[in-house]
Amino acid sequence: MKRLFTGATAIILLASVLSACGGNSNSSGNAGASSSPSTGGSSSAESSAGNEPKEKVTINLWAFTDEIPNMTTKYLATHPDANVEFKTTIIATTDGAYQPALDQALAAGGKDAPDIYAAEAAFVLKYSQGDASDYAANYADLGLTDDMVKEADIAQYSVDIGSKDGQLKALGYQATGGAFIYRRSLAKDTFGTDDPATIKNEIGPGWDKFFDAAAKLKAKGYGIVSGDGDIWHPIENSSDVGWLVDGKLHIDPKREQFLDLSKKLKDNGFHNDTQDWTEAWYADMSGSGKQPIFGFFGPAWLINYVMNGQVKDTNGDWAVTEPPTGFFWGGTWLLANKDVAKDEAKKAAVADFIHWVTLDTSETGLQNYWANGTMKDGEQGTKDSVASAVVMSKSNGQIDLLGGQNMFDVFVPANANASGKNLTQYDESINIIWRDQVREYTSGNKSRDQAIADFKQRVKDELNIDSE
């Protein structure tokens, strides 16, 4: 999935037929993608039944990274009788390129229209519940039932985000419930232990305890987080309601509190005042910032795909525990075009692939490979948190970066504690405006009231959304 890597390096326009190349692991981001259009051979499987093979079903798959397209290779390897080929289009979200292209393709319809398409957390509600939701098939119409969801014990927040009026339209394969990821050595020096069960009670529940811990860490010369962006995601996704109520801009009290908590971090020197996705933020993962930083908030993907390449000498000096408040961050959902139901063969093929990715809890299901890092035969890939608690409960989440801790012991409850009922289809744009104004306030460039007023005005000017 694309995990909110907004600094993607290139626009990927790969209106291509995926070649059978297989990913090295559960890869993230835009690895292996070209910055210019390229075309290859079909990713397909021949039917072994009958003397005259039936014409293959072509599935048009749209995505914004090569992650889901790479899954088709594993699917075909584990389904040798699948009479299907995948025609893949990958367009990066850089500069907002993916959504307009997807919207146009869905509206145009026809044989080249997307049959399966991906949407990430930043804009999935547009396709599952919002303006573009009418294009999406109900999972039930594909034979993917609520009982299957229950049997797989899919994280409820993922179901809520993918549902409209009680009808499931999208599911993810990954679960992105968040934890607090902290330095063991700093925990021992400050709190006398690095035990996750003890640390969770030092930093929470609630922000009051978190800031009590920040004061203790500061006395030892440590910051509790790298920047205010580190607390934004748990604040944003633990709010009671989203940015819109009855079509008008609403500032949930928990989100408004971000102004005060951000200022408290800055005024007390509790962080290094970095911005996420910058070199200074990465430096704090390796312990090379201006003061050692205790921790970061994030899902398993932050550990696997971001910190793993940045921790350097601090590798193994990390652990995960429950955060002060439940939240999720990121994720990718799969949707099917409702028009696939018009062709029984295509409907069956699309349903089988989506089931394998999102609901199959067997040893040959995508989520089992994903959780255990076994996507590529004979190689240990990256272990990751998945949507099915059934799969997580029987998988081994021990990783070296966490000193051998089984991260699934923390991420299973983290996924259960996340809420998917506070999102809107405008979150990506509104969040940028909000965080800009919070930084203006904490930097002393404007008053709290002015920051809120300017936030409301920019939302009106840029999105034509009035305030309550």
Report residues per predicted region.
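Short, low-complexity disordered leader/linker segments with a strong preference
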Residues: 1-58, 450, 457-468
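Short, well-ordered beta-strand elements
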Residues: 53-66, 84-90, 116
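Extracytoplasmic "Venus flytrap"/periplasmic binding protein-like
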Residues: 80-154, 189-190, 287-295
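Extracytoplasmic ligand-binding clamshell segments of periplasmic binding protein
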Residues: 97-99, 227, 237-323
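Extracytoplasmic/periplasmic substrate-recognition and gating elements
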Residues: 107, 310-381, 436
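Hinge/lid segment of periplasmic solute-binding proteins
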Residues: 119-179, 208, 317-319, 401
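Helix-loop-helix "hinge/cap" segment bordering the ligand-binding cleft or interdomain interface
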Residues: 147-149, 159-231, 243-276, 338-343, ...
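C-terminal capping/gating helix-and-loop segments adjacent to ligand/active sites or protein-protein/ligand interfaces
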Residues: 396-463
